[in-house]
């Protein structure tokens, strides 16, 4: 895992205890790499846009993990669940058959690693949500 924390990461509120892990997919230009996503977030934040998505981790198209925000800080990725949710954004696989293959093999491997790490840190079992 690469670590490249956002410049304002230390100013985010502390998270008491994560109890939810959620994966989202970025879409649009500039979401292929963590470096591009980080640059966009930094520019937005500096410009006063504090509503921009601030994930804990980003998975590039081929799967390398980059931590943008420590897991003990509150991110902005899950609306009312932000205070207790670890948010992970995955790069959009432009041109791929998203319905049939939403993630690359590298992304799937990184997602599995994150799930195991989350379960080890929190003690929660790895379960797929069946209802909201």
What are these regions (language model features)?
Residues 1-129:
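Active-site-adjacent loop/helix surface patches within enzyme catalytic domains
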Residues 132:
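Short, conserved phosphate-binding/catalytic loop or strand-edge motifs used
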């Amino acid at each position: 895992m690469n670590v490249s924390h956002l410049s304002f990461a230390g100013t985010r509120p502390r998270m008491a205890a994560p109890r939810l892990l959620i994966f989202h997919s970025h879409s649009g230009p500039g979401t292929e790499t963590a470096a591009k996503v980080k640059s966009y977030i930094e520019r937005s934040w500096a410009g006063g846009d504090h509503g921009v998505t601030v994930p804990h981790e980003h998975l590039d198209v081929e799967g390398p993990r980059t931590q943008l925000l420590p897991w003990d800080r509150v991110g902005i990725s899950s609306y009312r669940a932000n205070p207790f949710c670890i948010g992970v954004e995955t790069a959009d696989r432009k041109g791929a058959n998203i319905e049939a293959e939403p993630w690359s093999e590298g992304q799937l491997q990184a997602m599995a690693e994150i799930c195991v790490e989350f379960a080890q840190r929190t003690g929660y079992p790895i379960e797929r949500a069946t209802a909201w």
